[in-house]
Every structure is written in structure tokens, then in C-alpha cells.
UniProtKB/Swiss-Prot annotation:
This is Outer-membrane lipoprotein LolB. A lipid is attached at residue 20 (N-palmitoyl cysteine). It comes from the Bacteria. The gene is lolB. Plays a critical role in the incorporation of lipoproteins in the outer membrane after they are released by the LolA protein. It comes from Vibrio atlanticus (strain LGP32) (Vibrio splendidus (strain Mel32)). It is found in: Cell outer membrane.
Amino acid sequence: MSKLRKITSLIFLTIIMVGCSSIPEQPTSVEWQSHQNRLLQIENYQASGKLAYISPEQRQSLNFIWKHSPNQSQLRLTTFLGQTALNLTIDSLGAKVVTYDDQVFTHASASVLVEQLTGLQIPIDHLPQWFLGIPDQADSYQLNSTNTLESLSKQVSSQLWTLNFANYRNTEMQSKQLSDKDNVKVETIPLPTRLSFKQDENKINIVVSKWTLKK
């Protein structure tokens, strides 16, 4: 593991994310319970953008693609030169990482595996819900003025994580009407575009530049 971690560290770019281009945010006000029910209906989605990781030990700035479906999730981190820093797949059997030189590493917990290989502490097991703005089993959470999730706190493996959802954007979602299987209805739903995760001195800033989703 230590050898791979050293190799992985060389691939990571030590660039601090100073700022990101602004994204127009025009979220609509929602009724929270109804909104949460709609979020839970989203079975397949993809989010892509930029991720900045800051800790006392390292600072990284990376591109990310997060894909989620009922049977599998995938997180891919790449440098700004296009090099793959992490290619993680999660399914019912556990987590698997395939490295740039085709080495394969597995673990029951995705979060543990990523930390062992890269040193990054990321609560990956909760990302499928947190990315969408669902307070998955949160110890506490707060809503903002538009009744979407503003913040949450969650104890994960004896570590207290706090999340803030700074911005939302209305995102198109295709859904089939019950009366006609071939009739596809396009509706919109506000989804997070700026998120921050904090645990002790570790901080993760995420900017989602593109959402792709469907029920």
C-alpha cells in the first residue's frame, strides 16, 4: 500500500483550487417533504466538476466524475492534465480500485480503501445521498430559505462530518408519465452545485458543473 500511495501522490497535482467560474443559480422554492420524495426517486445520475481537498498533510485540486445507479457507483478523479488519479467502483461486493498501471485493490469499505491508497479522507459511503442533497441518516440538518438542504452533521466511524450546501441550480430530469410509457415528461428539480465537507482539519470543496439524471 505504501508504494502505491507514493506513486499516487506523484500523480496528484498539488494545485490549490483558488476559485471556480461562476455558475448561474436559479433555484425554486420547494416543499421539503415533497422535494425529498422526488430526490429519492432518482435512481440513476451523474455529477461532474471540480474537487479540492485540503488537509494539514496535503492539498489537491482535481476533476471528478461521480456516477450512481441502483447496482453500482463509480468515482473517478483526474488531474488537470487528464491523468487518472483514482478509479473507484462500488457494488454489492464492496469497493475496488484499478490503478493507472492496472493494479487492483479491494476493500469492504470504499472510504477505507481510498484513504489507504491516497491518504484522502472522504465519506464515500454516504455520497449517493449527500450529492443530491438528501440528509442520509444525519444526526442533525437545517434547511435554507428555499426549503432545500443547507447543512447537516453526521458522525461517521467516530468522525464528525459537517456539510454545507451553498448553491443549488434547477436541473432537468426526464420521467415517464404513468398513462403513457412512451411519453417522456421533462421536469426540473433543484440540485446542489457547491458543497463543502469538513471533518476536523480536513476540508473538501466540490463544485458540480454538470448534472445528468433520470428516474
